[in-house]
């Protein structure tokens, strides 16, 4: 379906070029696509490591996986970050802090939920003190499954977020 839409658009652009020698497009669409492309290539995640998933998150920044080559640079301050990676078990006491940090991030902001505990409570799902998924506190864009998920899985989640931003899906806020 998406490929057919792409082919139709390509034919319309080529026909316009053949008829007039140039292509006319809506300037706002062009600017939006350039902005989405640039945002996808310069993600600055803020780590919110709560448990063992945070160790795997650290591996992605090391030389073997090297997130820098994708334009991803970890930030310590929420005011400098546009992506929050929630990694690990979120307790009821930590939930207000998570929300406060999320609110301090500038728009557009995205959230990656990493690991079974962040996705749905994981091993501690039935504990009275555990939030059963960080999506109950903040809106989540990408879920990375696993206990703990591998560094490759997080890398794939980041690449999926980049593609979501480029496509400009309505589910992605601010894109």
Swiss-Prot record:
One of its GO terms (molecular function) is iron ion binding. Coiled coil: none annotated. Keywords: 4Fe-4S, Cell inner membrane, Cell membrane, Iron, Iron-sulfur, Membrane, Metal-binding, NAD, Quinone, Translocase, Transport, Ubiquinone. GO terms for biological process: aerobic respiration; electron transport coupled proton transport. Binds 1 [4Fe-4S] cluster. InterPro entries: NADH_UbQ_OxRdtase-like_20kDa (IPR006137), NADH_UQ_OxRdtase_20Kd_su (IPR006138). Pfam families: Oxidored_q6 (PF01058). This is NADH-quinone oxidoreductase subunit B. It comes from Anaplasma marginale (strain St. Maries).
């Amino acid at each position: 379906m998406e490929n057919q839409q792409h082919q139709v658009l390509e034919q319309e652009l080529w026909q316009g070029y053949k008829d007039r020698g140039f292509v006319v497009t809506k300037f706002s669409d062009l600017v939006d696509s350039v902005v989405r492309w640039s945002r996808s290539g310069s993600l600055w995640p803020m780590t919110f490591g709560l448990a063992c998933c945070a160790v795997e998150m650290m591996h992605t920044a090391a030389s073997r996986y090297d997130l820098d080559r994708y334009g991803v640079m970890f930030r310590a301050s929420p005011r400098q970050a546009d992506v929050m990676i929630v990694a690990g078990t979120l307790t009821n006491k930590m939930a207000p802090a998570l929300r406060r940090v999320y609110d301090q991030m500038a728009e557009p902001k995205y959230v990656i939920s990493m690991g079974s505990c962040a996705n749905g409570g994981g091993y501690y799902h039935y504990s009275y003190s555990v939030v059963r998924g960080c999506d109950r506190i903040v809106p989540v864009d990408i879920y990375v499954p696993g206990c703990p998920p591998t560094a490759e899985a997080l890398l794939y989640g980041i690449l999926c977020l980049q593609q979501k931003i480029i496509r400009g899906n309505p589910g992605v806020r601010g894109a």
